[in-house]
Amino acid sequence: MSSLDRKKPQNRSKNNYYNICLKEKGSEELTCEEHARIIFDGLYEFVGLLDAHGNVLEVNQVALEGAGITLEEIRGKPFWKARWWQISKKTEATQKRLVETASSGEFVRCDVEILGKSGGREVIAVDFSLLPICNEEGSIVYLLAEGRNITDKKKAEAMLALKNQELEQSVERIRKLDNAKSDFFAKVSHELRTPLSLILGPLEAVMAAEAGRESPYWKQFEVIQRNAMTLLKQVNTLLDLAKMDARQMGLSYRRANLSQLTRTISSNFEGIAQQKSITFDTKLPVQMVAEVDCEKYERIILNLLSNAFKFTPDGGLIRCCLSLSRPNYALVTVSDSGPGIPPALRKEIFERFHQLSQEGQQATRGTGLGLSIVKEFVELHRGTISVSDAPGGGALFQVKLPLNAPEGAYVASNTAPRRDNPQVVDTDEYLLLAPNAENEAEVLPFQSDQPRVLIVEDNPDMRGFIKDCLSSDYQVYVAPDGAKALELMSNMPPDLLITDLMMPVMSGDMLVHQVRKKNELSHIPIMVLSAKSDAELRVKLLSESVQDFLLKPFSAHELRARVSNLVSMKVAGDALRKELSDQGDDIAILTHRLIKSRHRLQQSNIALSASEARWKAVYENSAAGIVLTDPENRILNANPAFQRITGYGEKDLEGLSMEQLTPSDESPQIKQRLANLLQGGGAEYSVERSYLCKNGSTIWANASVSLMPQRVGESPVILQIIDDITEKKQAQENLNQLQQQLVYVSRSATMGEFAAYIAHEINQPLSAIMTNANAGTRWLGNEPSNIPEAKEALARIIRDSDRAAEIIRMVRSFLKRQETVLKPIDLKALVTDTSLILKAPSQNNSVNLDVVADDELPEIWGDGVQIQQLIINLAMNAIEAISQADCETRQLTLSFSGNDTGDALVISVKDTGPGISERQMAQLFNAFYTTKKEGLGMGLAICLTITEVHNGKIWVECPPAGGACFLVSIPARQGSGT
């Protein structure tokens, strides 16, 4: 008997193999053979020994059991004839060739399929190799066969390839949808320019006709004109962005004097500088000739100066300089003495829709597109733009532009025709920020018998509108910002405060906070009027500090009704406080006493009665980690499961605190929860949180924390039970990401189908605007002018403009890509928006649409866009089913109501279509199941996903009269903390 000695070859080539020499056996031959056989048969993978001709000598037990054979059956027989290779004749022939190759001295390795599981009845994939073994003379005497089961690996690779393919297809579809969306908005923006021109043109004609007549509606004409110009500016900006996205924005190069262009734009701001007492310094050379797109260069300078004047306080300094940089480059610098831009935000400010918001100086108007467009125009010129700190404080913007156009570009000469005037600045937009007679706080002589209302609004047009609505019933005085309002309130407290949120100097939410801090003002009711539809902020303000929150736009009738309610409550409260003060008490004191009394009644001690033996068994054998800590969160005891989860031993945990195992960003919340628990302010709680392990890794767990029963004289002991959910959380995050992508793709596809309907819905109000504008022109042109009819026409123009703006807002909101955030849903707005979206497709398919909603609906938390997508998916399925069938009655009914117990919202989508068979109902919500000729079959699966995200249920019923009825139940919000 000989032993094997495996050596590595000195030089390896295609035909090299490991050199294994045979040596004489030692004196302990029997023992060594026994050990070798134990090891050989104990190997988990396939191992076999063949002679030089490929006949079987030895095979380990695992390989034999996998094929369902014995060694005696195959010993001495060709290896390729064994059970493993009997999948097919081709497999047998392939194995024979591999043996012949190895017998010639070449190492063989490949992936093959064999009958190697369940007694040779199941095919598995193995990483197979044949290693030639030679004696000392170099002759091949054995072949060592090895195989490693890689079936799971192959399946995983195939699944990964499939998922990658699906992801690539989804990404490509999203890209196409994004391009379609950009094209759609470009078309909508372009179509809006015509009706806006038809608003402004007739309006200018009316104003020209009424210029010398002292029309009582002149102020309203100016408001309409000013805001229509603002809307036109935003439409033009969106059109520019769409062109840049489509790479259709080009440059019209012209040889021009940059000094003259810069000087012309700068001169438009001199009036604003005088009104705000700002030192406006321009340093320009006499002449600097460059090849640029003049219009885009003027837009660059205009936007930079506009930002500087927005953020520079009264009495500040603004500089605009033009100079040569390195050879063949012009350098434009615009600096101000405003609050500056933090380094962390200097990249973000050039992103689209980003607006800088800093304490004490907030951008109250605009879309956040100005600097984004500046950057785009600069890069089109192959230039650069940067921002840094200005000397002495403030922001310093630097723009570098090449003086020469790219080689081969067409450059117009100075004599080529150009528009008559350079860029004209609409300074009215920036004059609103300057202090003048209208913007200063206005206080009228008060009459003692009328309640006082203070209006805080930075926009003069809106301020004047609110004042006109209320001045007939109340004593109204105004302030342009929160700081001035706080000063006025200290001297003359109002009965009602009406404030905007986004204002310069002091914002509305900061004003509310300051008012509530002052005892003498804390009882004043506050109404917030804002165009910022932030549901989270709205709920926070309503729950903590304000009595009403009204979104812009709003009707004058609704404003008067809400103001009347708040003022009446304030007057009644004042009378009650006065009555109670005569008795030596106050409402606030009584309320405080009631709350404290109720809190004491709710406190109780929870007794735990578990035996020591039972506790010990649970403690030591539980799969969940159990930790006992003192009030300082120091670890007293930790069970084996916790030690295994975190990697700390029993000695490692001695003297450690749970805070040392807590990531720093979670530590404040954990401390607060623990303090509430110890102080009796919170009951037993469960929280999902992370822990730091000994090896530096982080795990996620569900932690349940409670107080142990406490004996008299003993310190409190805290029980913490930790359930490791790291793998579950990672899987859930991956699933959530895929679901978010799928929901967004579905929403984009839905909006793509609605493009024609939305365009139709926008055209209707725009056509009405044009008709009413022409009618108003005729009525005002009559002698005498028909003022009442003109007024009604203007009111209809405003109404239809609001309707077009609402449609655009609704589309932007529906397409906005964002993470799922659960927050209070405005059901009234959801019902209105959904009805508006479905109106056109239902009419186009001759389907009668009815939307029914209860007056009082349960309050639910969720993602409003996803809920709207769910309803639209169900409704469009119903419309399509009715359209494809020959239905005598074509009816679709959407209903919104509470359930019998009032703890859930029930949404019903009922149609009179052909209905659903029992066979179809069993698979209805399965992914990729569809009864249509086209489509992926994902619509109802996405509806199910959205419902489950909101902890709701979805099901379908078949009414006796025919058709189908889909029902969705979403639980109402329970408490204020969920």
From Swiss-Prot:
Q: Does the keyword Coiled coil apply?
A: no
Q: Which residues carry this modification: 4-aspartylphosphate?
A: 500
Name this protein carries in UniProt = Sensor histidine kinase TodS
Organism in which the protein naturally occurs:
Pseudomonas putida (strain DOT-T1E)
Give residue ranges for domain PAS. 32-103, 611-681
Q: Which InterPro entries match?
A: CheY-like_superfamily, HATPase_C_sf, His_kinase_dom, HisK_dim/P_dom, HisK_dim/P_sf, PAC, PAS, PAS-assoc_C
What does the UniProt entry say about where the protein is found? Cytoplasm
Q: Quote the annotated effect of residue 760 to A.
A: Lack of TodT phosphorylation
Q: What is known of its domains?
A: Toluene binds to the N-terminal PAS sensor domain but not to the C-terminal PAS domain. The two PAS sensor domains may sense two different signals.
Activity regulation, short description: Activity is regulated by agonists and antagonists. Binding of agonists such as toluene or benzene to TodS stimulates autophosphorylation at His-190. Activity is inhibited by antagonists such as o-xylene, o-chlorotoluene and trimethylbenzene isomers, which bind to TodS but do not stimulate autophosphorylation. Agonists and antagonists bind to the same PAS domain.
Keyword set, alphabetical order? ATP-binding, Cytoplasm, Kinase, Nucleotide-binding, Phosphoprotein, Repeat, Transferase, Two-component regulatory system
PROSITE patterns per UniProt: HIS_KIN, PAC, PAS, RESPONSE_REGULATORY
**Chain ranges of the Histidine kinase domain:** 187-405, 757-974
**Phosphohistidine modification, residue list:** 190, 760
- Give a GO molecular function annotation for the protein: ATP binding
Disulfide pairs?
Answer: none
- Major localization class: cytoplasm
Which factors induce or repress this protein, as stated in its UniProt record? Answer: Constitutively expressed. Is under catabolite repression.
Gene Ontology cellular-component annotations: cytoplasm
